[in-house]
Amino acid sequence: MAEMEKEGRPPENKRSRKPAHPVKREINEEMKNFAENTMNELLGWYGYDKVELKDGEDIEFRNYSADGESRQHISVLKENSLPKPKLPEDSVISPYNINTSYPGLATGNGLSDSPAGSKDHGNVPIIVPLIPPPFIKPPAEDDVSNVQIMCAWCQKVGIKRYSLSMGSEVKCFCSEKCFAACRRAYFKRNKARDEDGHAENFPQQHYAKETPRLAFKNNCELLVCDWCKHIRHTKEYLDFGDGERRLQFCSAKCLNQYKMDIFYKETQANLPAGLCSTLHPPVENKAEGTGVQLLTPDSWNIPLADARRKAPSPASAAGQIQGPGPSASTTASPSDTANCSVTKIPTPVPKPIPISENPNIPPVSVQPPASIVPPIGVPPRSPPMVMTNRGPVPLPIFMEQQIMQQIRPPFIRGPPHHASNPNSPLSNPMIPGIGPPPGGPRNMGPTSSPMHRPMLSPHIHPPTTPTMPGNPPGLLPPPPPGAPLPSLPFPPVSMMPNGPMPMPQMMNFGLPSLAPLVPPPTLLVPYPVIVPLPVPIPIPIPIPHINDSKPPSGFSSNGENFIPSNSSETPGGKPPNSSSSPRESKQGSSKPSDSSPSCSGQSLNQAQVLQEHSKNEVVDLTVRPSSPVNSKFGFPSVLQGPQDGVIDLTVGHRSRLHNVIHRALHAQVKVEREPNSVVNLAFGSSDKRNCSDCRDNCSPVDSKTLPCGDAAHCCPVSLASGTPGLEAGAAVCNVIVNGTKSTEGSKNPEPPQDPKKPQPPEELAVSELESVKENNCASNCHLEGDTGKKAGEEPLAGGDKQDPNLNNPADEDHAYALRMLPKTGCVIQPVPKPAEKTAIAPCIMSTPILSTGPEDLEPPLKRRCLRIRNQNK
């Protein structure tokens, strides 16, 4: 045995070939009996019939692998093609000829050695690993063994290499692989049917063929899934069928897929060709009723008969009301798939009346009074039906159609009133959306035939339409004829021409017809629906109220409306008067305070009162910059006093200034006369106000002069008449503030003050007043020249007083100032901030400048103010 095994186990690379010297040893009876018993026992383990070697001489047993899982097999081979005539034993023993030493023996040659050699070969069963190659070259002498057979497993034609007795028949295999696979399948079928074990071991491509060809004892029980075509060796096959044929599926998944497939095929075969048109309204025939019921999720759960009755084709739907019989009768017998909830879909119901031919067809009017009443034959459980001119349509389907229509421009939705006109081109189904609004019948109520009514345009409808009982409770009543339709891009119906102009179905908004069911955004349905079209909703946008008090005066064409012009511009001609003048133009009440320089005291008092109110305004911040600016302007003594005063009183002073500025804001002349002018560049009269404030702080008279100085801001003359140096400084400030003032831009002495003056917010309002008071600037310039002188001395005190004068006229402007600067110490107005600071600085500088000659060049100052203001514009 050892020698035999030694020789019988050729190297791995030689296993596929017949060994050069096969083992030739005679097997004694004991070994033969042992082999037979062992083989039978193994076969019994795997459910095979017992093999009698003597009886099975004619059967070629080859390489029966005992263990289906392992590669160690007991090769039971018989030299079938060459039965040993010498010794019956040999023939009996021959099955045990250990040709398995080369497991890949050609099927036919149990012992491909010489026939006589079978006995000499030492026929001894040997356990060898059987890993046969796909093809085993048969021995040359075994010509008979080269029998071409069709492998019982892989169904390929090949040389017979293995054969297996299946009791009544013998299976031939082309290779040991096929033999093992077949044996394993047989074993699993008989012994492990409850396991889904090794189905993967079967060549998937052969499953369909295996069933008929694998003639195992229980082969009849081997089932192929009718859906996935796989052999599942389990007991869980699901039977399905109506009795004529039983389909078997390996799993519920396959069964469901099969049912879906059957249902799909049946519906495809039975659905009218127009079914697709419902999804695509552009189809011309859609109006003709070709829009058959869509298969919606509800359709799957509703018996086909019910579904059919529920949603006949739109055209037939119209007829359905007349004679629901056709649609109901068309219910098809259930499909073969008993489990399919939907049976074959009946052929489309005959279209009694193509709506395209006559959209107003009376049959529709014959329909029940309202869609509220379900069409005859529609089961109560069916989804709500929408009565359209094409007939009752399930709401889900109708919604889909509406969505498709919404996709189209609303114009082609089909004008309602023209749709009513059979001859109306709009009713022509060329544009699916156009035509009698499908919603018309839907709204139909006890009122006159809804078909005609929906056709009417909203304005054509009597005003009672909104409350028509025909409107289903879920539908919105049509809006009043004149009321703009919600979310409609079109004007109210009343605005629409009554002529044949096609009105988008949306115009049928509230009409019982609900045209294409109301503008899509307003479509009312019993269940939530995604609205495809955005509805424009007016959103109130708060508008800055900076200019609310006196937008006309506050806003100057120069764009200084955001820059409050200091009232100083106005005071330029007449410090009190100027402020009152702009203010008078805005409010006559302030006029007395501004009437004359003598009123400046009153104005200052009023301004002080207002100052407290406007301290929270831009004026406060503006004043603060003013004091630093004043120091920069080179008026340290006068300006420093005012600065401190301005800083402390600035709030009040600034408030007054703001009031003055707001008063003068309309006459906003962003002139670069002085440092005040610089301020004015950004803030117009506000800058002047600042200057006036500084001057006012110096002295009441100076304060008046300061307005004149402010006027100088307005008018370059004031600056010129004023101290040239200061005037130049003011010009610089103006340049800095406005950046557009070429005249004062050339004067760079005070550009730094512009950055200092971030109080443009206050001066925005001032500039507004200034623009109004610009004309007063010239007259005020002289007064402000005087006040400017005093302002240099008493910028804070005089300025505050002067500012009250300004504030009184600027009370209206004061409102601007409050809006502009909520806090006295904070400059809120963004634009005027830099300008106002500059304005304050110019005010400080302007005080001497204006005091020097604010009155000198009043007309020139005014002209210059106007010119600079135009430049700023």
Curated annotation (Swiss-Prot):
Bias-annotated ranges (Polar residues): 554-570
Biased composition range(s): Pro residues: 460-485
Renumbered to this chain, the Basic and acidic residues biased-composition regions fall at 1-14, 783-793
Write out the GO cellular component annotations. Answer: nucleus
In residue numbers, the zinc fingers (FCS-type) are: 142-180, 216-256
Q: Where is this region: Disordered?
A: 1-26, 307-338, 413-485, 550-608, 742-766, 779-811
Statement: the UniProt record of this protein carries the keyword Repeat? yes
Please name the Pfam families in this protein's record.
Answer: SOBP
Annotated signal sequence is none
Q: Which GO terms describe its molecular function?
A: SUMO polymer binding; zinc ion binding
Q: Which UniProt keywords apply?
A: Metal-binding, Repeat, Zinc, Zinc-finger
Q: List the disulfide bonds.
A: none
Stretches of Low complexity bias are at 312-338, 571-603
An example GO biological process term is: animal organ development
The answer to whether UniProt assigns keyword Electron transport to this entry is no
Q: Which family does it belong to?
A: Belongs to the SOBP family.
Q: What does this protein do?
A: Implicated in development of the cochlea.
The entry's protein name is: Sine oculis-binding protein homolog
Q: Which gene encodes it?
A: SOBP
